[in-house]
Amino acid sequence: MATVSTGSLIFIVKKNSPMMSKLVFFWQNREKEFRDFGGFSEKSVYFCDTIDNRKRLILVVINREVLLMTFDAIDQLAVNTVRTLSMDAIQAANSGHPGLPMGAAPMAYVLWNHFMNINPKTSRNWSNRDRFILSAGHGSAMLYSLLHLAGYDLSVEDLKNFRQWGSKTPGHPEVNHTDGVEATTGPLGQGIANAVGMAMAEAHLAAKFNKPGFDIVDHYTFALNGDGDLMEGVSQEAASMAGHLKLGKLVLLYDSNDISLDGPTSMAFTEDVKGRFEAYGWQHILVKDGNDLEEIAAAIEAAKAETEKPTIIEVKTIIGFGAEKQGTSAVHGAPLGAEGIAFAKKAYQWTHQDFEVPAEVTERFAQGLQARGEKAEQAWNDLFAAYEAEYPELAAEYQKAFANEAAQVELEAHELGSSMASRVSSQQAIQQISEQVASFWGGSADLSASNNTMVKAETDFQPGHYEGRNVWFGVREFAMAAAMNGIALHGGTRVYGGTFFVFSNYLLPAVRMAALQNLPTVYVMTHDSIAVGEDGPTHEPIEQLASVRSMPNLNVIRPADGNETNAAWKRAIAETDRPTMLVLTRQNLPVLEGTKELAEDGLNKGAYILSEAKGDLEGILIATGSEVKLAMDTQEALEAEGIHVRVVSMPSQNIFDEQSAEYKESILPAAVTKRLAIEAGSSFGWAKYVGLAGKTLTIDTWGASAPGNRIFEEYGFTVANATELYKSL
């Protein structure tokens, strides 16, 4: 080994290393002394102070090889270009958040143009690209500036239309709307959990598909977050999970500027972030100067060198750097104004026009990000071609997994006379789907035994066994759902997650993001009504059905028996652009007459006639889930009195709403106004189906603690009460 003395620090290099010549080149004007030296760290970062009026150099020792990285005036110009494009876009819109882009531009630039392997020419089509998630989505102007400079399909004109109707540059990033955006992160904190999910997917697919000499899944997930993200509970849930899972290819860049919208974070956020993340099992790296490109680069290298822990790089920045009011909340969420922009540009020594990109900056991105990305993707294509020749079946499975095609499965029908809870029939469906869809995996928020989500004969997804298909999300409902979004966004798998339906309130913000992003995630929500019983009103859903049904682009399905549950799972696994929420019972449900033949087609229309009136149609009983059996029994009781009613099973209101007017009329004829809806949940939303002349047998108060059957009786879910209620129409 050998060392090079710089006057202040010792740099250790490997003798005859290819990097030695580069090292000598940088120090060619200085007398160099070499001597044998041993016992240094395998993974170390070394800094060199100014040498011969040169900028500070950085050396990173990874596995005893030395990497050199330097930055020059063009790099600084590129950083300032990101800043000025962001400021100009926000000013043109007269709306936006300039503080983060101005403060975080250096770390974002270093990451993008010097580290990330992405190819703007193929965008999100290359499965092994690095992923970047902007959890602090209010800093979208910075992301759009980077996307433009990187060469994605985003023009200067698009930047000028920031936050305008129909533009490619909405106020917060939206996947599938803006080229190159990886996730719609939405409210703060969720992007961190999305990144955790992406890193989980990478680890899972790598364990499943990689072979010696063929690391076809081998990429990093980077996320940029601020102080606000770390205050949110979902980020803490997700960070805890990531630390346990030892996701070494997950890197958070923390824009630590000590300012939130209301003012200094000292008013509300004073914890030891380093201590917290180290307790989670993360590596913490501090960058003291957020404008020091070399120090940022060293931190990213050190993060990539740590393979057993996720890394958070805390970068101390100045919010709104360069602005007259930098370092204050005044620059967080409002345009700087013409005078404010002029002040900042003067501080940057910016001599170019508004929205101008200097030619040398364009060239620097072409030589950096673009050239590196194209080379990396071509190398991967060559590797995959060889992999395909060596492992054709695995290669075909990999390609199929990323095609996001509708999965078709066959599920064993349930016979009349049998009885089981829909959560149990769901578990049987999960088992059968796992045997037919190799990319299918998931778990529960510490309720797998109750939600019945575990796949038998499969291993657990744990460190050292990332191939496992049973995921233990822990008591982290929000992080589970947000991580599922990241898993779905990554591609290559189909994921599900379960909890009690009453706990759905904990995860709805992430379900909303799934629906907004057209992600085919599946939520297994069990213990769906007051039939939960003894646990009492805190654990008995009432308003949840009405709440989730109001969410656009979410299939909410409450099946009546095992055959409807099968149909629900078939529908869910066939979806490619919409999440599905299955609402399932704790208590046993008998298989109903007719569902074996009618359920699949009927469920795919949202509602269907399960039992027709025996005479001239006088009225309609509409029910869902466990109450369909009550409707059938009520029909029989009314028939005994000479009253002829139809029973409509309506497992999914939203799917029914999407049917043609003709079909809806065939199920609920306008001329038939005597209608009774029966459901053990809120009445909210049922008026559109029963009309002004109809009634509901529902619950608009809280539940109680008692055996489930007794509660149903006390709340009027009996044949006698349903019969009298119908007759009162």
UniProtKB/Swiss-Prot annotation:
GO BP term, example? pentose-phosphate shunt
Q: What is its EC number?
A: 2.2.1.1
Residues annotated to bind substrate: H97, H332, R423, S450, H527, D535, R586
In the record, what terms sit under GO molecular function? metal ion binding; transketolase activity
- Cofactor info, note text: Binds 1 Mg(2+) ion per subunit. Can also utilize other divalent metal cations, such as Ca(2+), Mn(2+) and Co(2+).
EC supergroup of this enzyme: transferase
Q: Where does thiamine diphosphate bind?
A: H138, G186, P187, L188, G228, N257, H332, F503
Q: Name one Pfam family in it.
A: Transketolase_N
Question: CDD domains, alphabetically?
Answer: TPP_PYR_DXS_TK_like, TPP_TK
Q: Which residues form the active site?
A: E477
Residues at which Mg(2+) binds: D227, N257, I259
State the UniProt keywords alphabetically: Calcium, Magnesium, Metal-binding, Thiamine pyrophosphate, Transferase
User: One cellular component GO annotation, for this chain's record?
Assistant: cytosol
Q: How does it assemble?
A: Homodimer.
Function (record text)? Catalyzes the transfer of a two-carbon ketol group from a ketose donor to an aldose acceptor, via a covalent intermediate with the cofactor thiamine pyrophosphate.
The molecule here is called: Transketolase
Q: Which organism is it from?
A: Streptococcus pyogenes serotype M6 (strain ATCC BAA-946 / MGAS10394)
Which taxonomic lineage does the organism of this UniProt entry have? Bacteria, Bacillati, Bacillota, Bacilli, Lactobacillales
Protein encoded by which gene = tkt
